[in-house]
């Protein structure tokens, strides 16, 4: 990061660490800043609140934007994993309680975030996912919501929700269809297989693939390149919104299907969720140790 412009730490919330350039043109947001406490690197509610709070704080009103001024937001992770997806412990609890309202509130917060990221925080930001560890379920949906996915080799990526009878309902299908055919998007979702980042690159889902340890340098180079033609990249943000829009209502409609599908799951599916949670906890505690 220092090769572009020396970054300074500007924001420290409980679950994220943010480093920003002095002029505010680049923000690197690292999820799971509390990973040393043995927490699971998934979309816990407090992580989402910290992420969306920060992104809202740097979103400019139309009157605040300068013509030709392009900004960048990089989403990365302090944990070994990029993000393992939704909070399955919470899901199982809410499903057992038949609490549709709370489950929908969680899903809506996810949609609020990925929609804001996908639309470039109002249009003047290019969003980049830096995937240096596993991106599963909602973690992959987060990456897919970004304009560009930069991934290091050997990382696992996938949408395994079908293993417990569910589907990824926070943007996966909508965002995948912008990168691959509808048929391939359905295959990835319904088969639930894990892919390496190398395979995802060949499919056209990962935009930039680099060797292990070279992800940050690749993102720096990408930002430098885009900053040489800011007007073109700002225009492309607008063009994407016209030619290939992913609307908020579309995302919310799909996530309501997700909520209703989740509430119909049986005990076998919930036990599968809980086994995955235990595996995540073992991973988190091994890292914290």
List each model region and its residues.
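C-terminal extensions of enzymes
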Residues: 258-289
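C-terminal long alpha-helix characteristic of the crotonase
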Residues: 207-269
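Conserved CoA-thioester-binding segment of acyl-CoA-metabolizing enzymes
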Residues: 1-73
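Active-site-proximal gating segment of KS-fold condensing enzymes and close homologs
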Residues: 100-111
């Amino acid at each position: 990061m220092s090769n572009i412009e020396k970054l300074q730490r500007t924001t420290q919330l409980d679950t994220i660490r943010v480093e920003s350039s002095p002029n505010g043109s680049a923000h690197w947001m690292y999820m799971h800043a509390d990973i040393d406490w043995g927490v699971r690197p998934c979309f816990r509610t407090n992580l989402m609140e910290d992420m969306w709070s920060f992104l809202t704080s740097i979103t400019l009103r139309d009157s605040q934007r300068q013509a030709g001024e392009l900004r960048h937001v990089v989403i990365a992770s302090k944990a070994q994993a990029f993000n393992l997806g939704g909070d399955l412990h919470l899901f199982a609890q809410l499903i057992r309680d038949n609490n549709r309202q709370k489950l929908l509130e969680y899903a809506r917060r996810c949609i609020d975030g990925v929609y804001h990221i996908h639309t470039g925080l109002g249009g003047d930001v290019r969003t980049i996912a830096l995937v240096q560890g596993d991106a599963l379920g909602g973690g992959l949906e987060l990456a897919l919501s970004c304009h560009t996915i930069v991934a290091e080799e050997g990382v696992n990526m996938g949408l395994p929700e079908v293993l417990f009878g569910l589907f990824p309902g926070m943007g996966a299908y909508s965002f995948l269809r912008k990168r691959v055919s509808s048929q391939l998007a359905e295959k990835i979702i319904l088969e639930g297989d894990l892919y390496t980042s190398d395979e995802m690159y060949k499919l056209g889902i990962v935009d930039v693939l680099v060797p292990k340890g070279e992800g940050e340098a690749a993102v720096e180079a990408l930002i430098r390149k885009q900053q040489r033609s800011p007007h073109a990249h700002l225009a492309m943000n607008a063009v994407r919104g016209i030619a290939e829009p992913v609307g908020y209502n579309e995302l919310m409609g799909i996530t309501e299907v997700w909520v209703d599908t989740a509430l119909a799951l049986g005990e076998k599916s919930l036990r599968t969720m809980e086994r995955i949670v235990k595996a995540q906890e073992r991973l988190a505690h091994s890292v914290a140790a």
